[in-house]
Amino acid sequence: MGASGRICTVVPVEDAGEAAMLALSSPTGCVELRLDFYPGDPGEALELLATRLHSPARVVVTLRSAGHGGLDRRARGERRAVLARLEDLAPEGWLVDYEVEDLHASSGCSGCIASSHPTTPPTPRRALEEAAVAERLGASAYKLVYPGVEPWEQAAAARLVAEAGGFATSFTLGPGTLASRLTALALGAPLVFGSHPRAPLDGVPQSSEIMELYLRMGLGES
């Protein structure tokens, strides 16, 4: 898959209609629908979005919890039911993001993304073990993101991507986040994430900038 399909443009879903327009204007071939921004029933928003989005080709559906840096404050038990419903409602080929706690509490998933957002990086061995468990539980990709200022923290993220053979993505948050995302992309990560130019998020580089710099590196076509 080209870089455009591996760079997901984040779309905060505050209003389903506006989110659909943002998604359709994504500068990359992948969008992430952040349903934790939605004030109502996330399933209702997803149903509406599913009828309107015939492009981009790749869509990630996310209900990020407050414990992982998002806005959703449902208890894990309630989240499990909501995520299962989102997976049922999602069109074929769309990926639902399961935080690792949700995935472990469920009976697995069908091609989801297993994500983890710790405050400190796990050891590379622990990260690889967690990725392996996620794969056994049905995930098609593993995502590990954490704050990182020191060079070794960014190197640890890159090592996971390199050793996971296209199954894992990992990058750091903070001053070096753009370089960390580019490194993950260059090493074959299945996904990295950037903000929409019309809906910027604090601390998240724009997906169009990630794409531009990746192509400038001369590593491949979009």
From Swiss-Prot:
Quote the function comment for this protein: Involved in the third step of the chorismate pathway, which leads to the biosynthesis of aromatic amino acids. Catalyzes the cis-dehydration of 3-dehydroquinate (DHQ) and introduces the first double bond of the aromatic ring to yield 3-dehydroshikimate.
Its annotated pathway?
A: Metabolic intermediate biosynthesis; chorismate biosynthesis; chorismate from D-erythrose 4-phosphate and phosphoenolpyruvate: step 3/7
Q: Does the keyword Zinc apply?
A: no
**Annotated protein name in UniProt:** 3-dehydroquinate dehydratase
Q: Which residues bind 3-dehydroquinate?
A: 32-34, 64, 181
The protein's matches in InterPro entries, at most eight in alphabetical order, are given as:
Aldolase_TIM, DHquinase_I
Stored Gene3D superfamilies: Aldolase class I (3.20.20.70)
